[in-house]
């Protein structure tokens, strides 16, 4: 008896131990081997007795008893009859739980096709038989016969015959002269008759022979599926079912409701239809019914089985009584409500509660306040056991009573139980791992959970009604993990960027800012203090103010560890702040001897963490929080109407702008400017005005005012809030006290009448109406953004979930080059910030002395980065996840520092998931809109380059000409001007536009702010490179050129018009040529004629016969029209990059280096070819639509990777032409740019991890003598494995090129079918996997969660390792014992074995 009670917790069947899971197609024999009996009747349960009907869908004889250890008729009850089969009702006496495990089956009277293999595209049956889906369906649904064996007749093999044709053929050739069949039997015979080996050989031969690309692809597809069937051991005829399995009844329950009705699973309905139709078919066949009736019944049976497996995939959806589609077996797995995502990947858990959160400012960082009522409920089992141990109760029932009465001893025990037992707090949505953290509970009265203010940033929580959930880690291991890994004190740094995330905000910042203000002319200025006591005395006696400038004697510890005293200029407030600083020689008083804004405070916390360690940081954070709150309260900073200062000059600026707008309106009415130009100019003028007013307002608000009583007055409180970073921003202040500015229409365009009022003055009705558009759109955007961002995160997690740190070093020599990112002259991301925490790939040497500064494989710490920046090194090669050579996972050296800990990354760290969370979490902060760049509204196009540093100019790729006016002009597109400082270190680099006017030349010295170059942002010039006389070609008035008079200036403009649309203009090729003295077209120095092709809308700047010198402008192409393009920004751009989509107007990139040649035009496309420099390569040709402007001329030299036509490059092209490193650099920069605009910091390595996952496939270009098929995409690992095998066998190896897959595609093509099936397109993934007989090695996180094991990351990885070692040891011991047993047959007592040491 006792044994059985213990057994309740252990399943009857021992849990299977397995390392991998294989999925394949079930054969009829297999289905029968699972089954415990055939289901012959559609009945379920008897409506009166509620007992299952015999042979029905719930039959107890087949599936097992309904009550534990009790047969159906009640003859055998209790445990003692276990295993007996009752002779009356034939039910086995056992646990009722077997009804969840035992399956049944239905023998079909006619075979039916499995809909997944038929309809899931591409149709597997169709591919194997090489028949179209339409033909297959015609045969299956009894419309056409198919000839199986033509015999000696004129019919062809597999020919389709309609009813009439079949009868005619029978009359013509006689009944037995040929074999034709119809329905699933026919298909089954066809599949049975396939000889796979022969078919494979034929296909391979055909592939070698074929020239056509399309045919090759088709054959490759067939070959793959034939191979799949051969190697997986599946037989093709198993795709046609003769037996249908029936799942256990407890997985499709039927529950009686009160009132005599039943709630049932849809599957029972679907099974019932199958059984009904099957039985009817059997009966009809026995009765020898007419063919047509039987055929109809067979078709209905096929439809019933289709609906059971996948309702709605073919034909109408079968609906239940309430017009709702029935949920079929496939629907049980699919989608968010399916088995995978609803029950396997996320479950509801025990021991949890949720409540509203309130602020707990008196808590320590590692604590949270837990309401007593909640704690009592959550820790019940612990309390019961402790009551029992103390002898206060003997039974659970008694303990329950005590707890329910809430006796005083229960509270004492609760205190004991809760001591040092951490709980997990979680706030939904959990966007990154900091959304769940562990705290030690502190019991509190009330019903709300108290949360420490500093962790709010990590949870993204505020106290306006947010709720949080509490979970209790039960086992000792769980408690240990919670304490060591998840405690809030261990999560000081943000995993996305390594910056502190436990940073004061709002009130605390304001208090610290107030504390650290220094004001001139206050009482007691210049007094000297020796210690804190004197200072406090003086403050209380009002001799000095918090903000008074004083001198103070500061004691601190020097570098040598001895105390040092020094006198510093500071304020009383800053000294108070200095008291909470940890004593360390690395942290000086200067760290806080300044105005403390949020940024400064964050910097100090970072410094403390780096130099003093975690414990000190936590204590410091708690102290500075208390100080901040106290001083915010003492300061009493409030917010009054008069704090919003409207600048005096506001109306002056508004009036000036109004008159400008009026002028533009007038110019438009006079026809001098177009509507678009007027709109752009007006919008531009108002944007400038808004900026100016905002500047004036800031000037007035931040101005230091004098106090009438002497000294400086209190600082404006709104300014304090915004400047300290506590709340608000200059943009919001502008709306409060400046002017609200321009608003957007719902379509995204800007309304040209701005809102002149601010909130202090109040808006007029019209202004208010105009402002509602934008506000409403903002709210709608926010709602959409959340969903989109969540979906992006889900795709990212899915693609990267199996990226885990598995080894220390993969030993690769590869890496990627890093340099600072410079955007229009300003350094956006310094080299130091990009290489911090990464591993050097090669020795880093000083440029001047060639001395090794940093050895290869060194993890770069802050000190190394300082060394590099001091040495002025511009480029560093570092190791990266992209170049890591490990097969499974990434190595620690290639990954670098674990950003959340600041130490080298640990084994088993799930870096893929962290990367996905780091990129996905800020997704909600990104914008959703597509920017329309319309003219000047956002046209702060840079048209001037000024130097940001003093230095010396160097020019790379130099090509400068002095034009007719004596100006220097840039003649090439890839010219770069660099400014170097006195040591020769490059401080800034600028890309110079083609045709820009240069103000400096090589070797010139420039001062900061001096102009380097300028150009016209509204047009692109075409320049001449030789001196000569102008001639026109094909520039025919009225056909390819038209003259218009510019009314504002009265000058005639000649514009190239679309010559293809004019009469007789189709063959024209308009160009300007430059002729020499002999009247012949001159040659260019780089080869080719001096002929400049013109595109539509070019404006000519010269006349026939004019003399030109190099650098003169021949024509301009106005870019005003090109400026209204859409720029995809924000989230859609990030998604577009990760999905590796081809942009709409993709750039065309030169695939080889060479010379441009213009070929014959083709219809309305231009033909451009590149003559290669390297004679071994073949020339490349590109067809470009004629309207597109090509900025290259005949004879231009292009490098590999140059743009021939501007635009966004397609990432695939970058990969194909420039390789992996360039692609990675492009993706990282583009994605970072989107996040940078929103001020979000993400470390590059996260994006690199995701890009690594996108590059896992190889396309086979030449199959060599391997089993691969050229043109197929194959896993890199598999590709290498097959090549190694071929090499060992002395065969020719295959070659391949890396393929870039978007994240969705990459997730669906992972090695694990479990992971792919639970992501998207479940049906397709499972069908594919079953046909291939795929094995899931259970390597990723997702698969292991699904099968219910520890994940192979973090502590789960260590557990797996320990288990491995244990198994090895056991084996050694057992072998040793066997040996000893063999040597000594009857030794009395063997010596104890010495264990081999652990690995």
Curated annotation (Swiss-Prot):
Positions annotated to bind Zn(2+) 2: 810, 884, 891, 894
Residues noted as binding Zn(2+) 1 in the record, renumbered to the chain: 71, 73, 86, 89
Cofactor mode of binding and number, as noted: Binds 1 Mg(2+) ion per subunit. Binds 2 Zn(2+) ions per subunit.
Domain of life the protein comes from: Bacteria
GO-annotated biological processes: DNA-templated transcription
InterPro entries: DNA-dir_RpoC_beta_prime (IPR045867), DNA-dir_RpoC_beta_prime_bact (IPR012754), RNA_pol_asu (IPR000722), RNA_pol_N (IPR006592), RNA_pol_Rpb1_1 (IPR007080), RNA_pol_Rpb1_3 (IPR007066), RNA_pol_Rpb1_3_sf (IPR042102), RNA_pol_Rpb1_4 (IPR007083)
UniProt EC number: 2.7.7.6
Family: Belongs to the RNA polymerase beta' chain family.
Subunit comment: The RNAP catalytic core consists of 2 alpha, 1 beta, 1 beta' and 1 omega subunit. When a sigma factor is associated with the core the holoenzyme is formed, which can initiate transcription.
HAMAP family: RNApol_bact_RpoC (MF_01322)
Protein name per the record: DNA-directed RNA polymerase subunit beta'
Native source species: Nitrobacter hamburgensis (strain DSM 10229 / NCIMB 13809 / X14)
Gene designation per UniProt: rpoC
């Amino acid at each position: 008896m006792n044994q059985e009670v213990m057994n309740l917790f252990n399943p009857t069947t021992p849990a299977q131990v397995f390392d991998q899971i294989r999925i394949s197609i079930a054969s009829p024999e297999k289905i029968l081997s699972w089954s415990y009996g055939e289901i012959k009747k559609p009945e379920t349960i008897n409506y009166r007795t509620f007992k299952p009907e015999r042979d029905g869908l719930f039959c107890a004889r087949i599936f097992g008893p309904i009550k534990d250890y009790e047969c159906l008729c009640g003859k055998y009850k209790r445990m003692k009859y276990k295993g007996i089969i009752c002779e009356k009702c034939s039910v086995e006496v056992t646990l009722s739980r077997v009804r969840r495990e035992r399956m049944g089956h239905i023998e079909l009277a006619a075979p039916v096709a499995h809909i997944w293999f038929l309809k899931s595209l591409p149709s597997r049956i169709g591919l194997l038989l090489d028949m179209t889906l339409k033909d297959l369906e015609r045969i299956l649904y009894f419309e056409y016969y198919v000839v199986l064996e033509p015999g000696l007749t004129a019919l062809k093999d597999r020919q389709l015959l309609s009813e009439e044709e079949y009868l005619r053929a029978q009359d013509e050739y006689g009944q037995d002269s040929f074999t034709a069949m119809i329905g699933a039997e026919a298909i089954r015979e066809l599949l049975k008759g396939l000889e796979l080996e022969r078919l494979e050989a034929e296909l391979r031969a055909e592939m070698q022979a074929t020239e056509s690309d399309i045919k090759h692809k088709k054959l490759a597809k067939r070959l793959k599926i034939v191979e799949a069937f051969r190697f997986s051991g599946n037989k093709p005829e198993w795709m046609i079912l003769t037996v249908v399995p029936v799942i256990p009844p407890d997985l499709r329950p039927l529950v009686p409701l009160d009132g005599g009705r039943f709630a049932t699973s849809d599957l029972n309905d679907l099974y019932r239809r199958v059984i009904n139709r099957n039985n009817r078919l059997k009966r009809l066949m026995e009765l020898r019914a007419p063919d047509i009736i039987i055929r109809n019944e067979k078709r209905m049976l096929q439809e019933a089985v289709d609906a059971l497996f996948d309702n709605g995939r073919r034909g109408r959806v079968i609906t239940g009584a309430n017009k709702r589609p029935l949920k079929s077996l496939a629907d049980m797995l699919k989608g968010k409500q399916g088995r995978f995502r609803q029950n396997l990947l996320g479950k509801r858990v025990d021991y949890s509660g949720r409540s509203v959160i309130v602020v707990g400012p008196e808590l320590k960082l590692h604590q949270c306040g837990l309401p007593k009522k909640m704690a009592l409920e959550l820790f019940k089992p612990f309390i019961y056991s402790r009551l029992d141990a103390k002898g206060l109760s003997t039974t659970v029932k008694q303990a329950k009573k005590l707890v329910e009465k809430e006796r005083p001893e229960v509270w004492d025990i609760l205190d004991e139980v809760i001591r040092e037992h951490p709980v997990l707090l979680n706030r939904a949505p959990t966007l990154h791992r900091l959304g769940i953290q562990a705290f030690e509970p502190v019991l509190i009265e009330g019903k709300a959970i108290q949360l420490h203010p500093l962790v709010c940033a990590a949870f993204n929580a505020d106290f306006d009604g947010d709720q949080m959930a509490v979970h209790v880690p039960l086992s000792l291991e769980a408690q240990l993990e919670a304490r060591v890994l998840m405690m809030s004190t261990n999560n000081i740094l943000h995993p996305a960027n390594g910056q502190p995330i436990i940073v004061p905000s709002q009130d605390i910042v304001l208090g610290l800012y107030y504390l650290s203000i220094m004001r001139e002319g206050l009482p007691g200025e210049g007094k000297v203090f020796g210690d804190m006591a004197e200072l406090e005395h003086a403050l209380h006696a009002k001799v000095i103010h918090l903000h008074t400038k004083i001198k103070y004697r500061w004691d601190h510890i020097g570098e040598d560890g001895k105390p040092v005293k020094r006198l510093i200029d500071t304020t009383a407030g800053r000294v108070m702040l200095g008291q909470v600083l940890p004593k360390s020689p690395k942290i000086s008083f200067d760290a806080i001897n300044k105005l403390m804004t949020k940024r400064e405070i964050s910097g100090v916390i970072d410094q403390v963490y780096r130099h003093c360690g975690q414990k000190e940081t936590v204590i410091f954070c708690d102290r500075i929080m208390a100080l901040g709150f106290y001083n915010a309260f003492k300061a009493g900073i409030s917010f009054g109407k008069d704090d919003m200062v409207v600048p005096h000059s506001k109306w002056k600026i508004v009036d000036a702008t109004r008159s400008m707008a009026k002028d533009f309106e007038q110019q438009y009415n006079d026809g001098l400017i177009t509507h678009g130009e007027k709109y752009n100019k007006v919008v531009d003028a108002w944007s400038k005005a808004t900026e100016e007013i905002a500047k004036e307002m800031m000037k007035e608000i931040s101005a230091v005012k004098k106090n009438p009583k002497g000294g400086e007055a209190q600082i404006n409180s709104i300014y304090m809030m915004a400047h300290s970073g506590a709340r608000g921003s200059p943009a919001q202040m502008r709306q409060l006290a400046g002017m609200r500015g321009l608003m957007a229409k719902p379509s995204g365009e800007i309304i040209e009448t701005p809102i002149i009022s601010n909130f202090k003055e109040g808006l007029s009705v019209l202004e208010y109406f105009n402002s509602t558009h934008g506000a409403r759109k903002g709210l709608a955007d926010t709602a959409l953004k959340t969903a989109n961002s969540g979906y992006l995160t889900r795709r990212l997690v899915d693609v990267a979930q199996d990226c885990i740190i598995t080894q220390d070093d993969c030993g690769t020599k590869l890496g990627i080059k890093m340099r600072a990112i410079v955007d229009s002259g300003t350094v956006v991301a310094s080299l130091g910030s990009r290489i911090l925490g990464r591993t050097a790939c090669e020795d880093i040497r000083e440029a001047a002395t060639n001395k090794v500064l940093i050895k290869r494989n060194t993890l770069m710490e802050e000190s190394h980065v300082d060394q590099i920046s001091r040495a002025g090194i511009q480029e560093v090669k570092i190791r990266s996840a992209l170049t890591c050579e490990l097969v499974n996972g990434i190595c620690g050296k290639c990954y670098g520092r674990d950003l959340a800990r600041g130490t080298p990354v640990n084994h088993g760290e799930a870096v893929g998931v962290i990367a996905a969370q780091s990129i996905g979490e800020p997704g909600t902060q990104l914008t959703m809109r597509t920017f329309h760049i319309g003219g000047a509204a956002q046209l702060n196009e840079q048209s001037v380059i000024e130097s940001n540093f003093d230095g010396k100019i160097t020019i790379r790729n130099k090509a400068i000409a002095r034009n007719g006016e004596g100006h220097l002009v840039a003649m090439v597109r890839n010219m770069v001007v660099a400014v170097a400082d006195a040591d020769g270190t490059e401080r800034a680099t600028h890309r110079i536009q083609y045709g820009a006017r240069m103000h400096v030349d090589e070797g010139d010295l420039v001062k900061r702010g001096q102009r380097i170059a300028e150009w016209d942002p509204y047009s692109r010039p075409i320049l001449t490179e030789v001196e000569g006389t102008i001639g026109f070609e094909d520039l025919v008035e009225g056909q390819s050129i038209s003259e218009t008079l510019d009314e504002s200036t009265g000058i005639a403009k000649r514009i190239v018009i679309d010559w293809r649309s004019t009469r007789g203009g189709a063959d024209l090729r308009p160009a300007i040529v430059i002729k020499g003295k002999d009247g012949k077209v001159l040659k260019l120095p780089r080869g080719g004629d001096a002929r400049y092709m013109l595109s539509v809308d070019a404006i000519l700047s010269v006349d026939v016969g004019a003399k030109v010198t190099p650098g003169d402008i021949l024509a301009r192409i106005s870019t005003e029209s090109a400026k209204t393009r859409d720029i995809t920004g924000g989230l859609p751009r990030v998604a577009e990059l990760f999905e590796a989509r081809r942009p709409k107007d993709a750039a065309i990139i030169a695939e080889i280096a060479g010379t441009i040649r213009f070929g014959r035009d083709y219809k309305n496309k231009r033909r451009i070819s590149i003559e290669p420099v390297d004679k071994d390569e073949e020339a490349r040709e590109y067809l470009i639509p004629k309207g597109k402007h090509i900025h290259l001329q005949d004879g231009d030299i292009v490098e590999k990777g140059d743009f021939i036509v501007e635009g966004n490059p397609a990432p695939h092209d970058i990969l194909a032409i420039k390789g992996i490193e360039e692609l990675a650099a492009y993706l990282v920069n583009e994605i970072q740019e989107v996040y940078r605009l929103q001020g979000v910091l993400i470390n590059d390595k996260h994006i690199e991890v995701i890009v690594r996952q996108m590059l896992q496939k190889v396309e086979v270009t030449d199959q060599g003598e391997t089993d691969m098929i050229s043109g197929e995409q194959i896993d890199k690992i598999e590709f290498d494995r097959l090549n190694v095998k071929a090499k060992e066998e002395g065969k020719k190896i295959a070659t391949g090129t890396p393929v870039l897959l978007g994240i969705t595609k990459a997730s669906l093509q992972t090695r694990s079918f479990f992971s792919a099936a639970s992501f998207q397109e479940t049906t397709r993934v499972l069908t594919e996997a079953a046909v291939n007989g795929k094995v899931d090695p259970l390597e990723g996180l997702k698969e292991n969660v699904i099968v219910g094991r520890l994940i192979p990351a973090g502590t789960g990885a260590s557990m797996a390792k320990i288990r491995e070692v244990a198994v090895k040891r056991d084996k050694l011991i057992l072998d040793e014992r066997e040996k000893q047993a063999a040597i000594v047959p009857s030794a009395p007592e063997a010596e104890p074995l010495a264990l081999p040491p652990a690995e």
